[in-house]
């Protein structure tokens, strides 16, 4: 059995609704649901969730660990939430959150407007910092990657949009 799949999930402040095809987790920040895999049996046992492969195949064994990780992320998302911090490095690079849109000035001849998907919010504590928050880990990471993709850090001066903990290794310029 998968090592990840063996460990149970503690449902601290979250409620889980299990059906044959969906797993729905509700918490103080909202609710999120996921398709259940037919190869994995999910058991709710007094505030803990346990995942077991439905048969002895390698695929069922692997999917038990995958489902456990996905549901653990759902529980974490509805109780504490996920956030990703981005930093803008460069002269004139600015960000401003307006409702469900993120306005970016990244040195192009036009401003870049990024539409936030449902369930994801952007905050700008300062003009060069962006905090992306939400309950779905995949959506938060995807939005952060899309925003970073508008102007990734370039290797000579390091200008661009980068994750807050990202280390950009700078190249040396050519010498004559």
Swiss-Prot record:
Gene3D superfamilies: Ribosomal protein L6, alpha-beta domain (3.90.930.12). NCBIfam families: L6_bact (TIGR03654). GO terms for biological process: cytoplasmic translation. GO terms for molecular function: rRNA binding; structural constituent of ribosome. This is Large ribosomal subunit protein uL6. It comes from the Bacteria. It comes from Paraburkholderia phymatum (strain DSM 17167 / CIP 108236 / LMG 21445 / STM815) (Burkholderia phymatum). This protein binds to the 23S rRNA, and is important in its secondary structure. It is located near the subunit interface in the base of the L7/L12 stalk, and near the tRNA binding site of the peptidyltransferase center.
